[in-house]
């Protein structure tokens, strides 16, 4: 269950961040820690924002909710996939282990809406709906919407097509094999003992890595834990996507820099096994893979430090497999680029008002 103001939770850190201070369940120790907080820290504790998210939505549930969202868009029967998931979670306590139960609650909501009832009325007395709606919006909010994408006919002629649907992509380009399993939370020991707060996708050196959601580059370069890595922030600033252990020598596209706007489906880098070294461009990771992480941010105080929220994105990665970006190789530059361009209204809106003065 979520915790809001008055209750601070340490959510762990990404691979590049120092180990956070420990927490305790002992009330006496908690009081002692509170007394030792600075005024600024105590002020942060009083803010009203979500401090913990345990994202357990299954691929099945995301698929069911998304397809109904897409298929009913523009009709009176339309319900966003996030509202369907939040409604279900409010009844199940956030559990999506039973596909049958998921269908039961989603079907119930859809039937009520089709009879003319409003979502507002249906959730009025549903205690935790508002929490799950806010939490799931923070996780999934930029993945579905209106966009334009290039398509090609049988003769290869391209044209633009307006769509509503999934506009987020798998982190791995189409046609490139990879294997994965749910490894979130397993132990890591390089530098310090910690839990693995991402999702490893194992493949071949040079596999094109794709931007999952449109956003802007917030971090780029070498880190001793993540090796060559890219950090991309969503335009609403709720999500931070972390792509690590990129290829030695040629980790990412040469034009990228901090502040660059990237679109979902763009090839941003290449799989490798760099990292675990204070020296740049060193391969100290045994297995070639992409470390893909998702950090959720409700308040900027959660971006770095003891209160970071990293979610298990295994189910999300599997859901996004349905939408892989096709890429083609330029033999002269050895770069891979997406084959079909995209126009994202969210990116266009951001670029109209963005302040780039903070970037070199």
Q: What does each model-found stretch correspond to?
A:
Residues 174-183, 242-246, 302-320, 338:
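Short amphipathic beta-strand/extended segments with alternating polar/hydrophobic composition
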Residues 260-331:
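Conserved, short, structured surface segments that act as functional micro-motifs
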């Amino acid at each position: 269950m979520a915790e809001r103001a008055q209750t601070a939770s340490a959510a762990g850190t990404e691979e590049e961040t120092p180990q956070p201070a420990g927490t305790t369940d002992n009330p006496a120790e908690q009081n002692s820690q509170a007394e030792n907080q600075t005024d600024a820290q105590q002020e942060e504790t009083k803010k009203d924002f979500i401090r913990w998210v345990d994202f357990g939505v299954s691929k099945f549930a995301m698929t069911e909710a998304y397809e109904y969202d897409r298929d009913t868009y523009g009709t009176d029967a339309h319900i966003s996939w996030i509202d369907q998931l939040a409604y279900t979670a409010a009844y199940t306590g956030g559990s999506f282990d039973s596909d049958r139960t998921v269908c039961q609650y989603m079907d119930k909501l859809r039937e009520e809406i089709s009879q003319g009832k409003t979502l507002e009325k249906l959730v009025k007395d549903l205690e935790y709906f508002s929490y799950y709606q806010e939490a799931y919006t923070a996780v999934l909010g930029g993945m579905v919407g209106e966009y334009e994408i290039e398509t090609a006919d049988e003769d290869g002629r391209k044209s633009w097509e307006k769509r509503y649907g999934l506009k987020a992509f798998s982190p791995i380009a189409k046609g490139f094999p990879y294997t994965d399993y749910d490894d979130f939370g397993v132990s890591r020991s390089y530098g310090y003992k910690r839990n693995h707060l991402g999702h490893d996708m194992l493949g071949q050196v040079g596999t094109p890595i794709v931007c999952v959601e449109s956003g802007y580059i917030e971090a780029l370069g070498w880190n001793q834990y993540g090796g060559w890595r890219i950090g991309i922030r969503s335009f609403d600033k709720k999500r931070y996507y972390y792509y690590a252990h990129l290829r030695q020598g040629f980790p990412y596209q040469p034009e990228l820099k901090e502040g660059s706007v990237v679109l979902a489906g763009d090839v941003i880098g290449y799989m490798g096994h760099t990292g675990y070294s204070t020296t740049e461009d060193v391969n100290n990771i045994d297995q070639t893979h992409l470390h893909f992480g998702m950090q959720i941010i409700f308040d900027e105080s959660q971006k770095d430090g003891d209160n970071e929220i990293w979610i298990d994105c295994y189910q999300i990665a599997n859901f996004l497999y349905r939408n892989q970006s096709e890429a083609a190789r330029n033999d002269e530059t050895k770069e891979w680029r997406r084959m079909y361009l995209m126009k994202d209204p969210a990116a266009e809106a951001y670029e109209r008002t963005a302040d780039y003065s903070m970037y070199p």
